[in-house]
A protein has these predicted regions:
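Conserved RecA-like helicase motor-core motifs
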Residues: 47-57, 362
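A short macromolecule-binding patch
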Residues: 241, 350-369
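Conserved helicase C-terminal RecA-like lobe
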Residues: 22, 36-48, 61, 68-300
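Helicase P-loop NTPase motor core
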Residues: 1-49, 74-76, 136, 319-322
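Conserved hydrophobic positions within beta-strands
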Residues: 331, 339-341
Length: 372
């Protein structure tokens, strides 16, 4: 999958570095901005210096910051900074004057800006937030992100914009669901608070501004005119490269031209990678090798398809089969110990643990939870 792909590329990078190749001689290219997230995440974990050219870090992109502002406000209504960021995103007729009046009322009555909202369009916004707070009680984080994108109007506003910039932003927002899905599968709990705590560790990336020796990450659109001794071209799968939105003959020819540009950026060696399956927008789907790879003369390719040693990954933590739990069942959780089921939905268990841990929402089919 996409994690194996990143591990493979990082392993090859480390081999190059061990032979004396500087980081600055290496580039990782991809078709869509949304693909950068998993590379950022793993390079950061392994303390490998990198920069992104032609875009921002995933968590520094405006639309992702806007979404995080919604999530933080839903979790904590006293967060005035998050409220100020998202109250008029997308535009809903709440201008600077209204926001200043809300802030003044909050200061007068020594309360949060959220509590100071009493009428007008701001009250409509507040009702949306209250509705989303209720939604959070009964769905997974990935399902919840969909509800936030819909009820906030963010998704629809970007669709209506009908521009390449809007399409890219929407792709990034949809990719955020892969972040929540990975979190759920790894830890098994439905906790917006714990999710945001984890995200905060990677969302405030300090750029290696003073270090000229760093790997370059960029889309194939941004690489025109640049060359690197060693290039990794990732995600060569149908629907990614060529892009899923390219239907006409002319659009496919433009994608093919981009592929040529990407391939010819490598001065010494080029790696082309693809996956057998990939998490896209929170859904895992089988991958089909890009037609562009199949069009390359096989004699020019030195392929690697066998399993190679790689960093140990945690096993999949979700059972495919549905497991039956009932109200009152005694259960044991790997981390939280013994507890009692106090609510059951299609996908979520609400479990009361001891007073130090309290009540937790847990994915019903996660391996961390079992009946006792």
């Amino acid at each position: 999958d996409e994690i194996d792909e990143v591990f493979y590329i990082i392993r090859k990078i480390k081999e190059l570095i061990s032979k004396g190749v500087p980081y600055k001689d290496i580039a990782i290219l991809y078709r869509t901005n949304a693909q950068s997230r998993v590379f950022e995440q793993e390079l950061l974990k392994q303390n490998i210096p990198f920069r992104i050219v032609g875009s921002f870090y995933f968590y520094s992109r405006k639309e992702i910051k806007d979404l995080l502002a919604y999530l933080r406000l839903i979790l904590n209504s006293d967060d005035d900074i998050s409220l100020t960021r998202c109250i008029n995103t997308p535009k809903r007729g709440i201008g600077p004057k209204t926001i200043s009046e809300i802030e003044a009322n909050a200061n007068t009555y020594n309360t949060s800006m959220y509590e100071a909202i009493k009428d007008g369009k701001a009250l409509d916004f507040k009702k949306v937030i209250e509705e989303l707070k209720e939604d959070l009680k009964s769905c997974t984080l990935t399902e919840f992100i969909d509800k936030v994108l819909d009820k906030s109007g963010m998704r629809n506003a970007l669709k209506e914009e009908k521009s390449l910039e809007a399409d890219i932003r929407l792709e990034n927002l949809e990719e955020f669901k892969s972040v929540t899905k990975n979190f759920e599968e790894r830890v098994g709990i439905i906790s917006l608070e714990e999710f945001l705590t984890e995200i905060s560790l990677v969302s405030d990336i300090e750029e290696y501004k003073d270090d000229p020796n760093r790997i370059t990450l960029m889309t194939v659109h941004s690489v025109k005119g640049l060359e690197y001794p060693y290039v990794f071209l990732a995600g060569l799968e149908e629907g990614i490269f060529p892009h899923r939105n390219c239907y006409s003959k002319d659009e496919l020819e433009e994608e093919r031209r981009l592929m040529y540009v990407a391939i010819t950026r490598a001065m010494k060696k080029l790696w082309i990678t693809c996956t057998k399956k990939r998490m896209i927008y929170g859904q895992e789907s089988p991958s089909i090798l890009s037609r562009f790879v199949r069009e390359i003369d096989p004699d020019l390719i030195d392929g690697e398809t066998k399993e190679e040693p790689k960093p140990v990954k945690k096993e999949k933590r979700i059972y495919k089969e549905d497991r039956v739990f009932n109200y009152g069942d005694k259960v044991h959780h790997e981390t939280y110990g013994d507890g009692v089921v106090i609510e059951v939905t299609n996908t979520i268990l609400t479990v009361a643990f001891n007073k130090d841990i309290g009540i937790k929402k847990i994915l019903k089919n996660h391996k961390s939870i079992r009946r006792v």
